[in-house]
Amino acid sequence: MQKSDIIIVTGGLGFIGKHFIRRCLAEGRIVKNVDLVSYAADLAVKREFEEQRHYRFLHADVRKLDFLPECDVVVHFAAESHVDNSISNAANFTTTNVIGTQNMLELVRRKHPSEQPLFVQISTDEVYGDITEGRHSEASMLTPSNPYSASKAAADMLVKSWGRTYGLAWNIVRPANNYGMHQYPEKLIPKSSWRMRRGMPAVMHGDGSYIRSWLHAEDTTDAILTVIAKGERNTIYNAGSTLELRNIEVLQAIARILKVPEEKAWVATVDRSGQDVRYSMNDARLRSLGWKQSREFFAELEPIVEAVDIMRFA
């Protein structure tokens, strides 16, 4: 990818999307951001981006967008992503994550073949389902466990099928559980930090033994840019993590930072329906392109915890 390339980002006011856009703008790239401005949109970063000369904002819903501006790459982040919400309102996840992806693929397909951009689908490790031992590879069967992961798996399949049927160039990036600055406080780290700071206990599903792999949003940004620049087209890349933590270990780390006694730091609640025991991926394919995980979780965690701010959001 050249610095002169034009990148369309969908969902660029969301968590990973805003990290990706900030990096692209810092490197002098032209970015066009398509975003619905949902409840989780970062309004502070929206104002920040609008001051940038190489940035354009299109307030639109990916399900209804009817025109794709000129571009060289589409990076498709836009999605509903909170599992609890998918359990209570699965239809919204199906329409946004599946129909929204289909519509974006159709907009690419309608371009003249010489003008069709690369389509990069940002997926999730959750499409594989859980794994008690070992690691999932890109060839592993997709066995999603909840409406969110099922909708993302369906979207991935659409991307592959549009590639085979219509000849679109595509890549799929499947990152591990992301963390970083200014994530909307519905996910484990920001929600738990926000509650503890306000003198309320965090909420822990079950006994906290469920294991997640943690990857910083900046490392995910590196992964996506690496795939765009060096990846083999029509190929899936896992972006995994060397760090696996039980949920209770994450809560313990947050409590230490905020100096909250563990007996006051969290309360156990009934397990989420369809809870996955462990996620883990083999990312040797991505590492062969030169990518590596560079952020250290415990070194990054304190400023993230201290910076949680619900007033940034829509």
Which residues does each PLM region occupy?
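Residues in well-ordered alpha-helical elements
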Residues: 84, 91, 102, 182, ...
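Residue-level signal for the nucleotide or nucleotide-sugar donor/cofactor binding architecture
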Residues: 63, 88, 96-99, 146, ...
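C-terminal substrate-binding subdomain of Rossmann-fold SDR/epimerase-dehydratase oxidoreductases
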Residues: 18-20, 26, 196-314
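Active-site loop immediately N-terminal to the catalytic Tyr-X3-Lys motif
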Residues: 90, 173, 185-186, 231
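Hydrophobic alpha-helix immediately C-terminal to the catalytic Tyr-X-X-X-Lys motif of short-chain
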Residues: 154, 158, 162, 192, ...
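Structural element of the ATP-grasp superfamily
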Residues: 104, 159, 192, 286-287
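N-terminal Rossmann-like NAD(P)+-binding domain of SDR-like oxidoreductases, especially those catalyzing
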Residues: 1-178
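A glycine/serine/threonine-rich, flexible loop-to-helix segment
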Residues: 134, 185-195, 254
